[in-house]
């Protein structure tokens, strides 16, 4: 029986931390977790996609609170009193989402666990925007953490890429090469006892104890391509009228600033080590476009480095950035089995977006990406919104032979089967 991590701790059990890093709080429903063992990275991704499809109608749900920061991701009970899971960012391998079924999932390993033993944690929301923002927050955290670790690979000063907006993508069809019987619902565990990957993580207390930023801070100054609602105020009012504002997904332009402030607090030494002047961290903070556009362009990092990282990402991962010195033209670089393949995207005289050598036209870049995420024959492979963490560490650096910590079981784990992750 595996007993690692810090599951089930109440905030009062650990005392208050002297400093609570800035975090972004979101709400979701936890479905469960399943193992992803003894597979290479791409096979693990295919398995996760298969399992998300198999579990799309799973009725098991548990309301939880997710807190994002540059240190990692913490999951609390719905009341905010019990810390269920806490994953250091360096132990999270992959993040993905499925808009059609309102699913968000990430793969992570436990402290001192081998790289071949991973768990996938699955969450759902009531609408696509709720889970999309969870995925975007985690992906941008990956990128900002990499930038802080590798300041020498930052992008040189150049015009900021135009916004591309947030895209509700459809799920990809399963890729070939991996066939495995889907997990049954009785094999999906909601016991998070052994699914925690922070080594030592103080609890943050009740909901609202962390620092929150006002919504007005860091509003985007750029107009969204292909979107007539260029004003954040108009976007928000439209969302309120359509009653889909609950998740706060339309406030994505503020999350970039919040994540960067979290980076400054979580890694003060690395932040201060950034060069001053053009291309320094002040330029990074002022890049306050939406999370989607910054993730697509890997904002802040040089293009050669971004392409090198793309070559190591999952099949279908992509970068989208405007061509330098060319108006109305973009480069879409896609990770395929043949390597990274570039495609030219342009805007025609009718204001519609097209991919070179293909007749289809789209009203926005978002629509173009959405189409090629579900169309298998238009490109070498469909686009995939999933992202690998470039700062992922396969093993922990610590004293050799140190046994994993053992903590008391969760109060809701009543049976031996639950403790083994089969309840």
From Swiss-Prot:
PROSITE patterns: PID, SH2. The keyword Nucleotide-binding does not apply. SUPFAM superfamilies: PH domain-like, SH2 domain. CDD domains: PTB_tensin-related (cd13157), SH2 (cd00173). It is found in: Postsynaptic density. Keywords: SH2 domain, Synapse. Residues 296-392 form the SH2 domain. It comes from the Eukaryota. Residues 28-146 form the PID domain. The keyword Transmembrane does not apply. Residues 392-423 are annotated as: Disordered. One of its GO terms (cellular component) is postsynaptic density. Interacts with BCR. May be involved in synaptic plasticity regulation through the control of Rac-GTP levels. This is SH2 domain-containing protein 5.
